[in-house]
Amino acid sequence: MVCHGDYKKLADKTKHFDPHASHLSDRSPINCTACHTAHAKPKLVCNDCHTFDLKMPFSDAPESAKWDATIDAEAVAAAEKSAPRETVDVLVIGAGSAGLNAAIAAKRAGAKVVLLEKHSFAGGNSMLAAGGYNAVGTPQQAKKGIKDTVDQYVKDTMKGGRGKNDPKLVQILAEGSADGVKWLEDMGADLSDVKRSGGAAVDRTHRPHGGMSVGPHIVDVLRAQATKEGVGARVNSRAVKLLLDKDYKIAGAIVHGKHSGYYKIAAKSFCFATCGYGQNKQMIAFYRPTFKDMTSSNNVTSTGDGITMALNIGASMTDIDWVQAHPTVGLDSRILISETVRGVGAVMVNINGERFVNELTTRDRASDAILHQPQKRAWLVFDSNLYKSAKMVQGYDHLGMLKKADTLAELAKICDMDAKTLEKTASDYNKFRKAGKDEAFGRPDMPLGIEKAPFYAVAVAPGIHHTMGGVAITPESEVLDIQSRPIPGLYAAGEVTGGVHGFNRLGGNAIADTVVFGRRSGEHAAAYALKAK
C-alpha cells in the first residue's frame, strides 16, 4: 500500500494508458516517492530497472542510477578465512528469469536453495524483455493452426546464429520450449498470444494477451512462485568470489551484502545466472572494440560479474567476443523499442522516408542495414491500429518518444523526411500487403498496413543488446574448465553462457533460453548437491 491507495487502485481510476498499470507487479513494494516529489526526496527508480536516459515526465530526478562495482579485497580475504555464515545445497546467483527458474527447479528437487541478487529487486535483464517466448508444439500454436516442428525451430535458430551455435544446446532449447511454456502457465503466466519475430519461419513467439511485455510478467510470476515455495531470496547481495575445495569442487562463495558486509556462504553446488556484460564499458572495449561507443539497452547490473568470477577459477569461455546489436533502440536513449512493434506491422524507413530492409530479418542484418543508412539511424512508422493493439507502444508515447500526425505528409514534415517519398513508401507497402507479397524486400508477414490516422513514428538506432558468448556449458548446464572438463558443482544458464545462440540471437529465444536452461541448471545442481550429502 501507498499513501493514496495501491497501484492497482491508481491504475483502475484511469481509462487511458497509465504508468501505474505497467508496474503493478514490480513497483508494489516502493511508494510513490520513488518517482514523484512528495513527502520525501524522490529517486528515479525507473532507471535502476530500465536504464534509459530520457527525462521522465513524471519525475524531477533524471539522473541514472549507478551500480557500485568496487570490491574491498581485504574484506573478501577476511571473509574467506572466517566460518560460513550459513550452509546451503544450491546457491543461485542472479534473480532474473534464468536464476528464478533455476532456484525454483532446485527447490522442487528437494534442495536447500538461496538466491542472491545484487540489485535492490529481482528481475535483472529479464525485466526488459518485451517481445516474447519462442516455443514449438504448444496448444496456442495448434489453436491457430500453425504448423511448426522442432526441426524448423532448430533450423531457424541455427540459421539466425549463422551456424555458430552448439547444435546440441539448440536441440535442447527447441525440445524443451513447449514444456517451459506449460511450466510457466502452471504458475499462472499468460502466454496465450502467438506472433512472429524476426528470423522465424512461422508464428512461435508466445506472449501475454494484449501486447504486455513478456519479461516483467514472467518475472512477477516466477518471483511469486519462488516466495510460495520457500526459496531463500535476498536482494542487495552480490557474489564476488567463488570458492573451491582442494579437489577443485565448488565449496561456496563470498558475498557482499549492501547492509551486511562481506561474508561466506558454503554451498555444494552453484548456479551462475548473472546475465552478460552489455553494461560493462571496459569489457565491451576489450572484447568488441567496434561497439565501445555504442549505447546499451541492458539493465545497469549487466556488468559481467559471473564471467569474471568464472574466469578467475579457470572456466572456459566460448564466443565471448560476439555481441549482438539490437536494431531498434530509441535514438539518444537506452529504451529498447521491442521487436514486437515491427512484428505486428511497423515499417522501417531511413531519414529520407525510404524502406531499406525486410523489417523481420535477423537483428544483426537489420542493425547492419541501419548502420549503412544516412546518419546511421532510422524511423519506425505505423498507424493508429497498431498503436491501439500494443500497450507497450502507448508506453513509448507516454515517455514522449513518438511523433504523431493526422497525415503522412505532416508526419514527414515533423520527422524532417520528404513527404512524397514517405507517402509512396506507405502506399507501396499497403499494396504489397493486400497482394500478400512484399516485392521490395520479401517481408514474410504483414499483419497491419499504414492506413488509419493518426500516424506515428519513433526514431531508432542500433544499440548493444545481448552478449552472445560466455561460459562454456555442457547439455546438462555444467560449466567447463579450459580443458573442456565439467567443473564439479558449477552450473550456468542464460546470457552468462555461450553456445546457444551462436553469432546472432533470434528475438524470443532469450526468454526460452532462461526458462529451459534455467530449469535444467537448477535440476542438475540439486541432483549434484543432494548426491554429495
Q: What role is predicted for each listed range?
A:
Residues G210-K268, I307-I313:
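Helical element adjacent to the flavin cofactor pocket in flavoenzyme catalytic cores
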Residues K258-G261, I265-G330, F517-R520:
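Glycine-rich loop(s) and the adjacent beta-strand/alpha-helix scaffold that form part
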